[in-house]
Amino acid sequence: MVESGPHSINDDLSTNEYIEQPKFYHDDHASDSNSLSDIDDDNKKHGGLYGTVSRTTTRELPEDLESEISSTHSQDAKEDLEIQHNAAPYSLLNYRDKWCMVALLTACGFWSSLGSPIYYPALKQLEKQFDIDENMVNITVVVYLLFQGLAPTCSGGLADKFGRRPVLLIGMLIYVVASIGLACAPSYGVIVFLRCVQSIGISPSIAISSGVVGDFTVKSERGTFVGATSGFVLLGQAFGSLIGAALAAAWDWRAIFWFLTIGCGASFAICFALLPETKRSIVGNLSIRPKNPLNIAPVTLLPAARRKLKYDNPDYETLDKTKPVFDLTSAFKICALPEIFLSLLPPGLAFAMWTLMLSAISSELSAAPYNYKLTIIGVCYLPAGIGGLIGSFATGKIIDFQYKKKLKVFEEKKAAGIIPEDEKFNIMGARLQSVLPQNFLCVVTYILFGWSCDKGWKIPSILITSCVSSFCAMSTLSAMSTLLVDLYPGKSSTASSCFNFMRCSLSAILMGCFAKMKHSLTVGGTFTLLAGLVFVGNFLMFIPMKHGMRWREEREQRAALKAKSMDQANENGYKLFSKIKFSSPFKSEEKV
């Protein structure tokens, strides 16, 4: 809620939540602030890294210098410059600490992505034990994916309002309890119900993890850390079937859920002790101790941690002054914006096909002409896991490189007068451009995978196409998560849940229809049809790349005009009201 004049209005969800911040300049580089490359050179000279604490200085920007810096840098460039050279650093976490946070977030979210594919190799065992057909057993997969898309849209708002830590930990606890119930489930109906509960508990962790990374990174490094976090978290989806096949072959399907119980329980204990609260409206740059005990990690009570986080000298200026408003429909409103919807639909469909591919590996390799055992099928998932791992590491670096390159060209053109001074940097174009090559490449690999399974081609064709497809899927996820955090830094968990909702909803639809489509079109025909939809959909992404930022600016202007007119109307109403003279309704009775 933003206070404006005599009344309050809600921010339009299509715009970022802006708050008035102190203006800064850095005294060591004021003379050469026209070049971003000079800042990069200084970074290298000092051995510094974005987000480190050691080399930053800050002073208030005098009014006579404000216009000079404003005219030489875009908003994105100024943001990174101010953050990098600010005496109150954007985050007290150094480079090593940030990677430790990535490891903790992976421990949280890994079990969400693992919960679905670890189950695939055991589907045949469930069919036999409960005497159900393929369509019914697929329902247990579909409901998990469905709630994996829906639950984060609500939990993301809770995390943006009450903090990341309590929502993550409560979700993990629900997941552990549901996994115990699944391991002991006596009937098919109980399995379906507890799969819903299991998904509701753990699925928000993926979106919230992106929000946590957005809390302690700036745009110039965000791609690396969001990409790594998203990629590591979703490695469970790539390696899950390998683990599930080993467990089901050694024991039975119940061993899978005991494994999830033990693994997530251990991760819960680690995260409970070590994971700090990062929501900037609660802890700022981590120098402010949370008031709510649920937001306090035990490790931060140690003297060494207190000194590192500077609890004795908190910097309240780093607090996000925007008051988050919990809205259950917030994620859906963001997702419905044209530039967001057009950006998310093609990658979401491509990612849903990846989920379908992982399921198809198990079902197709267990049938003729392959007739592989569970252990061999599990090994066949290894290339998909390796491809996803490479995609996670490589894409983050590519995204950051693309961002810096585009921003540098933009700054040079602005300095040369080629583009207007008031034009904003097109961050949507920079981020989406890094997605398109992978999205077009996966069209080819999905078609080849489908026909490899359909015609019984040699197994290397299936392994290679699954590896490349996994690389593309992880690349797409990293780029889209980074873009959403960039566009909505104040509610990054809610924004990240939009892509989660899109990809999981489409995955649930495809999984629900796969058996019938395979029967009607064959595996090759099904993957060819869906890959064609991805190919056509990819061209939709060119629309937000070109017009997305303009649409957002137009909505900002309309929102500003609406706020101004409401202010004026309220002011006129107040003046009119003050001129009205009221007589008392109570009159003394006349004496008779």
From Swiss-Prot:
Coiled coil: none
Primary localization: membrane
Phenotype of gene-disrupted mutants: Leads to intracellular accumulation of flucytosine and clotrimazole.
Residues with attached carbohydrate: 138, 285
Transmembrane segments: 99-119, 139-159, 166-186, 188-208, 231-251, 255-275, 340-360, 374-394, 432-452, 459-479, 497-517, 523-543
Any single GO CC term annotated in Swiss-Prot or TrEMBL for this entry: plasma membrane
Function: Multidrug transporter acts as a determinant of resistance to acetic acid, flucytosine and clotrimazole, these 3 compounds acting synergistically against the pathogen. Reduces the intracellular accumulation of the antifungal agents flucytosine and, to a moderate extent, of clotrimazole. Its role in acetic acid resistance may be indirect, presumably through the transport of a still unidentified physiological substrate.
Protein name per the record: Multidrug transporter AQR1
Organism: Candida glabrata (strain ATCC 2001 / BCRC 20586 / JCM 3761 / NBRC 0622 / NRRL Y-65 / CBS 138) (Yeast)
Designated gene of the protein: AQR1
